[in-house]
């Protein structure tokens, strides 16, 4: 049984910053398995890289380890950052489903705000509109989508994504 925390850091040419990440939580009764999420808003490149610092305490003894981690660019855009009308920088991420079906899919979305370069708390109490579009078919949408909302403060947002046929869909989150 350990107490665990982590801090991802992007080392850029002129600055360093973190990204949205959850607490690390114990998920096994014997204390040998922990989980959490990290939402990387940008990929590494030839001169800029991510590392992950993990702090943990076992039987009152503190330990720290830091390792460079691989964060390659994604083929699909799943993260967006934007400046809100309130002057706050927001980050929105498509989390799930990883393999959507022609059906009404359970959907998970994350919404965070940039408090400062190292802190990105979850935004509470918003509604995320789910608007799937099929560009090759006249940009039509689909019925039965359910906007994503939080079940409890501090958590990710859950909704329903309806896909009516196979093919390329663009999922707009508003």
What is the predicted function of each stretch?
Residues 1-13:
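Acidic/polar, low-complexity intrinsically disordered N-terminal segments immediately downstream
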Residues 8, 38-40, 56, 111-113, ...:
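Hydrophobic beta-strand positions in extracellular immunoglobulin-like domains
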Residues 13-21, 138-144:
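Short beta-strand and strand-turn-strand segments in soluble, beta-rich domains
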Residues 45-51, 102-104, 125, 154, ...:
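Extracellular Ig-like/FN3 beta-sandwich strand-entry sites
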């Amino acid at each position: 049984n350990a107490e665990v925390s982590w801090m991802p850091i992007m080392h850029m040419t002129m600055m360093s910053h973190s990204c949205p990440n959850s607490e690390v939580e114990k998920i096994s009764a014997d204390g040998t398995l922990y989980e959490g999420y990290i939402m990387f808003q940008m990929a590494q490149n030839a001169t800029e890289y991510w590392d992950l610092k993990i702090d943990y305490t076992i039987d009152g003894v503190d330990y720290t380890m830091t390792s460079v981690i691989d964060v390659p660019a994604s083929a699909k855009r799943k993260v967006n950052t934007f400046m809100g009308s309130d002057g706050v920088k927001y980050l929105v991420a498509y989390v799930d489903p990883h393999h959507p079906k022609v059906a009404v899919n359970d959907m998970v979305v994350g919404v965070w705000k940039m408090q400062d370069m190292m802190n990105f708390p979850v935004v509470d109490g918003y509604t995320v509109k789910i608007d799937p579009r099929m560009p090759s078919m006249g940009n039509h949408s689909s019925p039965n989508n359910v906007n994503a909302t939080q079940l409890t403060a501090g958590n990710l947002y859950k909704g329903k994504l309806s896909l009516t046929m196979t093919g390329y869909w663009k999922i707009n989150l508003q």
